[in-house]
Amino acid sequence: MGETIAKDVTELIGNTPLVYLNRVTDGCVGRVAAKLESMEPCSSVKDRIGYSMITDAEEKGLITPGKSVLIEPTSGNTGIGLAFMAAAKGYRLVLTMPASMSMERRIILKAFGAELILTDPLLGMKGAVQKAEELAAKTNNSFILQQFENPANPKIHYETTGPEIWKGTGGKVDGLVSGIGTGGTITGAGRYLREQNPDIKIYGVEPVESAVLSGGKPGPHKIQGIGAGFVPGVLDVDLINETVQVSSDEAIEMAKALALKEGLLVGISSGAAAAAAVRLAQRPENEGKLFVVVFPSFGERYLSSVLFQSIKKEAENMVVE
């Protein structure tokens, strides 16, 4: 028998499972399968780009462990994907993050030894980006990984996420549904799938409150990780057949339903993506079609957020019986 022990944590990234949704699919004539990125080593899809962006910069000779200072604006999950990589490789990491992101994110980032600077929540991700640029300008040997602009972001999804979906569905996937944060997942995986089958439909998901990709204005919303309020550089908008808008409330309700009815504890953006996928699978023209929806992160990262507000209060007020 050969040994199957990973040499380090980086070898645990990817090859996440696909699972059918069965009980939140009322009225669906198509099928919906979820790609569980919540089962990555650090519980989110961003583990893939944490790995790819650092590895890519190393291979190009742009950064060196122990010498370079990595800086990145993040809504949390990319920061965590970078933080566990930085810890494993020996980099100093400085992150800027809007103060509106969940408390779990702050704690996890600090647990991995990252330095964290909070930015004005009203300025959204733009504020975090500006702060990161300011810090880089005055920090020696600094390097901004730039997830919104870095080609290594969609590249890893083209090389891994897309092929995994194709293989996992036996090439039978008809539509990809993905929330758009940086646009890396939908661009990379979507491009790969479209090359395998030109008829595959690619659906983006964005918050109704900040529907920039649909021509709307940026605005505050509760779906952490998507709807950055601008069109990211890595996003290939021409790939997308349709952008589905989902409200924060709908996303939260669906995330709750996924836990209660499917046994899947996921974040708010997974709720948004699932709500969009179910809506698509209910359309008469999609009868018999298979939609793969990306669930970007695990629900435990949102315990302090609006997603679990009522349950948290209930739990805090419990008494011994």
Swiss-Prot record:
Chemical reaction(s) catalysed: O-acetyl-L-serine + hydrogen sulfide = L-cysteine + acetate
Record pathway: Amino-acid biosynthesis; L-cysteine biosynthesis; L-cysteine from L-serine: step 2/2
Keyword line: Amino-acid biosynthesis, Cysteine biosynthesis, Cytoplasm, Pyridoxal phosphate, Transferase
GO BP term, example: cysteine biosynthetic process from serine
Main localization of the protein described in the UniProt heading: cytoplasm
GO MF term set: cysteine synthase activity
Subcellular location: Cytoplasm
Positions with a binding annotation for pyridoxal 5'-phosphate: N77, G181, T182, G183, G184, T185, S269
GO cellular component: cytoplasm
EC number: 2.5.1.47
Residues bearing the modification N6-(pyridoxal phosphate)lysine: K46
Cofactor(s), by name: pyridoxal 5'-phosphate
Tagged with keyword Transferase: yes
Gene3D superfamilies recorded: 3.40.50.1100
Similarity comment: family membership: Belongs to the cysteine synthase/cystathionine beta-synthase family.
Self-association and partners: Homodimer.
Protein name as annotated: Cysteine synthase
Organism, scientific name: Oryza sativa subsp. japonica (Rice)
Top-level taxonomy: Eukaryota, Viridiplantae, Streptophyta, Embryophyta, Tracheophyta
